[in-house]
Amino acid sequence: MRALLDTHTLLWVVDSSDKLPATVTAICEDENNALFISIASFWELAIKMSLGKIELGDNALAHLKTWCDDNAVQLLPISLSHCQQVQTLPFHHRDPFDRLLIAQALCDQLVLLSADGHFADYGVDVIWKHSKDT
């Protein structure tokens, strides 16, 4: 499986958070899966940290990049085709970072690992299910 981690998913995987469903944890731990994180997620975190909306500590982005390198999570750059895909998306919601992740998943045929309920509205494959969900 080729999977794109949403920004919150990356933070929760790094933190080994109990907010992660077992299915997502299993996907992230399976060495047969190719995992990706968008450079847009690093951009989003940088903006949120600079605005004081999230506190991750000094050098957080460098630490996250090192964690990605150590765990074979590939950085996904933003391409022109991703930008063109964003332009065609309906406006189910307006978060520009989410819209870019959706475009990247669609263009690069990636499954999104995200708790965001809006993603499925765009026809992208999303995995996020807690065992209590049925």
Regions flagged by a language model, labelled:
Residues 55-65, 69-115:
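Active-site neighborhoods of divalent-metal-dependent phosphate/nucleic-acid chemistry enzymes
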Residues 7-8, 45, 86, 105:
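Generic structural signal for small/hydrophobic residues in well-ordered secondary structure
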Residues 39-47:
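Short, conserved active-site loops that position catalytic residues or coordinate cofactors/metal ions
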Residues 6, 44, 98, 116:
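Acidic active-site catalytic centers that drive phospho-/nucleotidyl reactions
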Residues 1-38, 51-66, 108, 117, ...:
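Short, well-structured N-terminal submotif of metal-dependent ribonuclease cores
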Residues 71, 122-123:
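Short, structured coil segments at secondary-structure junctions
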Residues 44, 85-88, 121-122:
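Phosphate- and divalent-cation-binding pockets in alpha/beta enzyme and binding domains
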